[in-house]
Structure formats: structure tokens, C-alpha cells
Amino acid sequence: MLDRIKIALQHLLPKVWLTQLAGWGADRQAGMLTKLVIDLFARIYKVNMQEAQQPDTASYRSFNDFFVRPLKPGIRPVDPLPNRLVFPADGAISQLGAIDDDRILQAKQHDYTLEALLAGNYIISDLFRDGLFVTTYLSPRDYHRVHMPCDGILRDMIYVPGDLFSVNPLTAANVPNLFARNERVICLFDTPFGPMVQILVGATIVGSIETVWAGVVTPPREGIIKRWAYPMEGEGAVILEKGDEMGRFKLGSTVINLFAKDRVQLMPGLASQSVTRMGEAMAEALDEDILARMSANDDTDTTP
């Protein structure tokens, strides 16, 4: 009964207004009041401040500064093996596995299509038919910067307006097409492992979604799909390395990764609800050509 009430409230509450209010409040610099709010939040959600570059909560001017806090250098080592991709964020796996033609599992008895997730872009959708996906949920206690699973060159960024349902196991199991309905930022990369999509999904009280190359992508929420294309090289190119920060959430939410067919395989033992840490191995190369190229690069590496 309680779950039904929670889901009903998700449909009834003015989510955009609440999100705007939360974003406004989280940006306020209110001195001791800000510190009290941060201390209360850290206590309720058991945030490990010893991992933060600034463990003293008084050092954060606003709640958002605290929420996107950087970690101490080296606290999240990135798996060094060149044939491995790493988790982009701290959190827990919501779902993962094979894409069934164009259908992605959201929760038991719920799925959604690639085209719906990718805002109707059938060209990008076709790249990932029968591929693999990983959905990572970031809880309030987690580190909320998002990193690159592997080296990548950005080709497209697409902002998709949408709903702002909360994202958690309850809504995933009860709100159809949750990730294809919520506001999101889609990033398509060329990588050594073939095309890869990394999607930052918004939610209720997610004040903003940012990328390192474009800054704040949302807000403003203008209600229209926006697309930016990027060159492979030269001025305007966005070239990132494995483990580099690529974006961040201010209050939220979920990261979805898509991989092309027969390019990578997920690491053994991963399952729904597995805890993730940025930099730990998520998948490894499956394509023999990729492995051969990586081996050749290692053989010619002259680094002392």
C-alpha cells in the first residue's frame, strides 16, 4: 500500500517546480545553515567524508559544492589493463546484460527500446542492437562525478527533455519506460572498443547535469531536443582518456552505458545490485582485432 502511495505521488507532485526549488536552495551560500544541512545529510546517508578531498564540511560554500565534492587523489585507482573498461561512477548496478534486438531491461517485466532511450535516433540506435548495457544508480551518499570507462572521442551530445521521476528500485519496477521518459544527456563516443554511449539521466531534484566540455547542459529546461556534433580532431574536438571526469550530477541520479555487439564482455560476477566503484573493471575487450591492436601498442610502448 505504501509503495502505491509513493508511486501515485510521483505522478501527482509538481516535479519540475520541486526540482527548480531544490536546485535554487542547493546553490545558496548560507554559512552555518549550509553546514548544518550538509552535516545532517552526511549523517542520514552515511557519507564517507574521509574519502573527500575536503573532509571538513565547513569548507563547502553551498550544498551543491558538497554534493559534487572531489575525492582525494588516488582514492579511486583506475584499472590499468588496456583491454578493460571501468565503471564510470560509484553506485550500484540497477540492471545489466544483453540488449535483446533493441530492447533494454529496466526491471522485472519492464523494458524499453533503444530508439525511445535515444530520442528516436534510429541511426545511433542501430549501432547498439544486440549489444550490451549497464545501468548504474547513484544513491545520495555516493560520489557524483562521472568518468570515462575507456579512452573516447566525443562525436555527438544530445539533450532530451522529459519527466523528472525519481530514479530508484521502486520507480524502476513501477514506472514504465522510466529512463526513456526522464530528462537526459546522451553522449556518443568513438572508442577502441567501438561506439559507446554514456547517458546521464536526470530525476526529481536533480538540479543540473553538467559535462566537462559544455558546462551546465540543463537547466534551462526549454522542452526541445538539442544536438551538438563534435569533430574528431582539431579545434572543438573533445578527446578524453580512461578515468577522466566527463560530467557530474547536482543531486542525482543514473548513468547508462551502451556497447556495440561482439565488442566487449561484462566482467564475471556482476549482477543487479552489485556495488560499483569508479575505476574498477566493468567489461573487457571481446573483439580479437581490438586485443591484437592493444597488444601491438603495448609492444611498441617505449615508456621507461
UniProtKB/Swiss-Prot annotation:
Q: What is its main location?
A: membrane
Which cofactors are reported in the record for this sequence?
pyruvate
Query: Post-translation: what modifications?
Result: Is synthesized initially as an inactive proenzyme. Formation of the active enzyme involves a self-maturation process in which the active site pyruvoyl group is generated from an internal serine residue via an autocatalytic post-translational modification. Two non-identical subunits are generated from the proenzyme in this reaction, and the pyruvate is formed at the N-terminus of the alpha chain, which is derived from the carboxyl end of the proenzyme.
GO MF terms, alphabetically ordered = phosphatidylserine decarboxylase activity
Q: How does it sit in the membrane?
A: Peripheral membrane protein
**Subunit:** Heterodimer of a large membrane-associated beta subunit and a small pyruvoyl-containing alpha subunit.
Q: Which InterPro entries match?
A: PS_Dcarbxylase, PSD-B, PSD_type1_pro
Which residues does the annotation list for site: Cleavage (non-hydrolytic)?
Answer: 252-253
Annotated PANTHER family: PHOSPHATIDYLSERINE DECARBOXYLASE, PHOSPHATIDYLSERINE DECARBOXYLASE PROENZYME, MITOCHONDRIAL
Please verify whether the record's keywords include Nuclease.
no
EC number(s) from the headed UniProt entry: 4.1.1.65
Report any Pfam family annotated for this entry: PS_Dcarbxylase
Q: Which reaction does it catalyse?
A: a 1,2-diacyl-sn-glycero-3-phospho-L-serine + H(+) = a 1,2-diacyl-sn-glycero-3-phosphoethanolamine + CO2
Q: Could you tell me where this protein is found in the cell?
A: Cell membrane
The biological pathway it contributes to is:
Phospholipid metabolism; phosphatidylethanolamine biosynthesis; phosphatidylethanolamine from CDP-diacylglycerol: step 2/2
Q: Which GO terms describe its biological process?
A: phosphatidylethanolamine biosynthetic process
Q: How is the cofactor bound?
A: Binds 1 pyruvoyl group covalently per subunit.
Question: What name does this protein carry?
Answer: Phosphatidylserine decarboxylase proenzyme
Give the GO cellular component terms, alphabetically. Answer: plasma membrane
Q: Spell out the family assignment given in the record's similarity comment.
A: Belongs to the phosphatidylserine decarboxylase family. PSD-B subfamily. Prokaryotic type I sub-subfamily.
Catalytic residues at: 90, 147, 253
Q: Does the keyword Protein biosynthesis apply?
A: no
PTM annotation (Pyruvic acid (Ser)): residues: 253
Provide the alphabetized UniProt keywords.
Cell membrane, Decarboxylase, Lipid biosynthesis, Lipid metabolism, Lyase, Membrane, Phospholipid biosynthesis, Phospholipid metabolism, Pyruvate, Zymogen
